[in-house]
Each structure stands twice: as C-alpha cells, then as structure tokens.
Amino acid sequence: PNYQVNPIDVQGLYEAEKSLFGISINGTTLIPCEYFAQNHCTIGDFFAGIFYLCWVPVPIAFGLWLYWKGERKVYLRFAMFFPLVNLIGFAGYYIHPAAPPWYAMNYGFEPVLDTPGNVAGLGRFDELLGCSIFHSIYGRNANVFAAVPSLHAAYMVVALAYAAMGHCKKWLIALFAFIMVGIWCTAVYSGHHYLIDVLLGIFCALLGIFAFEKGLMKWGAFKRFFERYSKYIR
C-alpha cells in the first residue's frame, strides 16, 4: 500500500484547499466540497452521477470507435498512452498518499488505515434512482488514501486531446469537452476530490501527452516499432 511508502496527507491538503479555494459563509470558511455537501440540488445530483459514470466507458468507447473507423494510428497512440498516464497517476499515489475530502469531512484528520470506501455525494444519485451503482463501486474501494492526482480528471483530457489530434468531428470534440468539465465539477461536487486533486490530474494528463508525443514518438526505436505495429493491425 502507498501509505507504507510515505505518510498520508489528510490535514495539509484540506488546509491548502481552504486557503486557495475557500468559500466564506457567515464568517466560516468552507472548502468547496463542504459547500456543495450543504448546497446541492436534485438536477445537480443526477447529472453528477451521469458524468462520473462516463469517466472510463467514454474513453474506451472512443478507442473502439477509432479502431472500427480505421483510424489505426490515432487509435494506437491513444491506446499506448493510457498505461503512461496511469503510471504517472500511480506514482503520484505513492509519492504523496492523500485522503479525499469526504474523509476529512467525516473522520477528521487522523488517518485510519482500515477506513472503508465511501460513496460520498454520489450516494444521492443512487437514492434518486433507487439503485446501488456507486455504492457497489466505492463500497469495495480497498485503499481510500489515493486521491492525488485525480485520474477521474485526467482520462477525459486524454480522450479530448486525441479527438482533437485525430481531427474528429467538431460535435464530438465539443461533447468530450462538456463531459470532461462535467467530471471535473462532479469530482468536487460529490466530495471525492479537492480542486487541487483535479488540477493535478489535469497536469498529469498534459505531462503524459507531452512526454509521449514529444518524447517517445520522436525516439527512433519506438517510432519504428510504432510504424510496424500500426501496419500490422490495419
């Protein structure tokens, strides 16, 4: 587990969020997640659930669509990049183990290693539809101290970037941008991520894209492998 490598950050991240993005109400400063825990609405809860359900299926569907459309080079770059962004994310989890905002809001600042996963604000979506979609996902979370960076924030950045690089239809690029921003907002609205986590997730995606496109794809040996493999899967 990452918390055996480095100490868990619970209070530091919370205080940084409050300092950078705090919302003052009646003389009290709340982090955005606390504000939305107290100020939410049915339509917001519904769309939050819809957006969060998109974070993995939409990139997967996009990759399959690229393959079926015969855009094999864009597909291959997109498919090869995902392990890299995940590696960057997992490196972040081990470099800086961190609790999500719902942990600080519900349990305080002392890390308890056997804390179960928590559906947080996404539970309102389950209640609204009378289902247990997010309870089944987050109730099985084995390690809650892996909030930084937010890969939820990163994945749609990657999908949007490769949709743009692949010269996809403008409506698809606009749709991906809409879903991407919706996921960013939901991460905070639901209490699953700080704004800091989201920004770091975006940074990881952009860093990974730069490293892959301007580094690996320019390296002769890798480029030759890529060209041979892209011809093989045509």
What is each model feature region?
Residues 95-166:
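Membrane-interfacial catalytic/cofactor-binding modules of polytopic membrane enzymes
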Residues 60-96, 102-112, 176:
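Interfacial segments of alpha-helical transmembrane regions
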